Design a protein with these regions (language model features):
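Beta-strand secondary-structure signal
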Residues: 76-80, 138-140
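Short beta-strand edge/turn micro-motifs at domain boundaries
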Residues: 102-103, 132-169
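Mixed-charge, low-complexity intrinsically disordered segments
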Residues: 85-132
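Bacterial N-terminal signal peptides that target proteins for export
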Residues: 1-8
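Post-signal-peptide N-terminal segment of Sec-exported extracytoplasmic proteins
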Residues: 39-78
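C-terminal motif of bacterial Sec signal peptides marking the signal peptidase cleavage site
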Residues: 16-19
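Bacterial signal peptide processing site
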Residues: 21-24
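Beta-strand elements of well-folded, non-transmembrane domains
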Residues: 81-87, 143-145
Length: 170
């Protein structure tokens, strides 16, 4: 009788662990989010220092999966993205650049402009009171032969850019 009871308790515990696992689509989303940050960092390896700093700022974005609804080969994940408020900071940067250099930066001021940009974004990275925005996104995913694919990536990228997505047309 004790053996049967132990077996039932053990079986129940295993079922609870399996049932409490994350859905495959959520795991795929988490992988894609990490890939986005690593691809962004790789893309910036040969770029100027200002662009590298911007990539570091974007990489500070985090997410929380609030809800997952799987319906066959389609899934909707309700996700909250917490990202640096780039919309605000880029507007401040553009205003500072325009004030200091005008609308067009002359060739002889290019090096000074690059240093200004690097300093601005470095200071932003080091700011302990940096402002974040939280954006709720409904991420649509579809299962294909290659696995789960995000079908509305622009919404996710826009949220990850912290309000700066509209500045680049997203």
């Amino acid at each position: 009788m004790k053996k049967i009871f132990r077996y039932l308790v053990l079986s129940f515990a295993v079922l609870m662990l399996v049932a409490c696992g994350k859905p495959d689509s959520q795991k795929a989303f988490e992988e894609r989010f990490k890939e986005f940050n690593s691809v962004l960092t790789k893309q910036m390896e040969g770029a100027d220092e200002g662009s590298k700093k911007m990539a570091e700022i974007i990489s500070k974005a985090t997410y929380t999966v609030n809800k997952v609804e799987e319906k066959g080969n389609n899934t909707e994940l309700n996700v909250t993205i917490k990202a640096v408020n780039l919309g605000k900071y880029i507007n401040e940067y553009v205003a500072a650049v325009t004030e200091k250099y005008g609308v067009n930066v002359s060739a002889d001021k290019q090096e000074e402009f690059n240093k200004f940009s690097v300093d601005y974004f470095t200071n932003l990275l080091n700011d302990k009171n940096i402002e974040y925005v939280e954006t709720e996104v409904n991420v649509q995913m579809q299962k294909s032969e290659e696995g789960w694919v995000i079908t509305n990536p622009n919404d996710l990228v826009s949220a990850t850019l912290g309000g700066a997505g509209n500045l680049i047309g997203l």
